Amino acid sequence: MLPEPYRLHHRADFSRTVRRGQRIGRRDLVVHAFVHTYDELAHATERHGDPVAAGSFVRVGGPRFGLIVSKAVGSAVVRHRVARRLRHMCATLVDEVPADADVVIRALPGAATADSAELARQVRSGLRKLGVTPGGGRSPAPRAHSGARPRTDARS
């Protein structure tokens, strides 16, 4: 079970993570991740009418996870089974994901027939590729080629 402080609840949090975060698709799910900074959180809080005194904003808890399991996945029973599996996987990832990250996992129709081990592998792979968990990360943009050939000295 995923404890309450580690869950995304508000529509704005889901929207921010999906729209402003990075996304990577896997066979049975799509992983969205958004890592916050202090300034972004303080600005968002001020916009909603909650003034924040300088230095008073502290995010309590750790990473937050949200799930999107639509009717395309299957019947209510199937959707809830997929959500329970994903929630359990998120609970095991709490210590690996940075505390200032929000992660949204959107289940695709194939998630209904995938087993738990396969879903876990896809979630971990997606987070690793996004650079949220150790051992991966997106490669930086390719550098522009200077046009110069590498020097090969045949002379000795």
Swiss-Prot record:
Per the UniProt record, the source organism is Nocardia farcinica (strain IFM 10152)
Q: Name one GO molecular function term.
A: ribonuclease P activity
> Mind telling me what this protein is named?
Ribonuclease P protein component
Choose any GO biological process term that the UniProt entry carries and state it: tRNA 5'-leader removal
Cellular component GO terms, alphabetical: ribonuclease P complex
Q: What is its EC number?
A: 3.1.26.5
Q: Which residues form the signal peptide?
A: none
- Catalysed reactions, semicolon-separated: Endonucleolytic cleavage of RNA, removing 5'-extranucleotides from tRNA precursor
Query: What are the alphabetically sorted keywords of the record?
Result: Endonuclease, Hydrolase, Nuclease, RNA-binding, tRNA processing
Give the span(s) annotated as Disordered. 126-156
HAMAP family according to UniProt = RNase_P (MF_00227)
Primary role: RNaseP catalyzes the removal of the 5'-leader sequence from pre-tRNA to produce the mature 5'-terminus. It can also cleave other RNA substrates such as 4.5S RNA. The protein component plays an auxiliary but essential role in vivo by binding to the 5'-leader sequence and broadening the substrate specificity of the ribozyme.
Which is one Pfam family of this protein? Ribonuclease_P
| Similarity comment: family membership | Belongs to the RnpA family.
Query: Which InterPro entries does the annotation name?
Result: Ribosomal_Su5_D2-typ_SF, Ribsml_uS5_D2-typ_fold_subgr, RNase_P, RNase_P_CS
User: What highest taxon heads this organism's lineage?
Assistant: Bacteria
**Gene name, please?**
rnpA
Describe, as the record does, how this protein assembles with itself and its partners: Consists of a catalytic RNA component (M1 or rnpB) and a protein subunit.
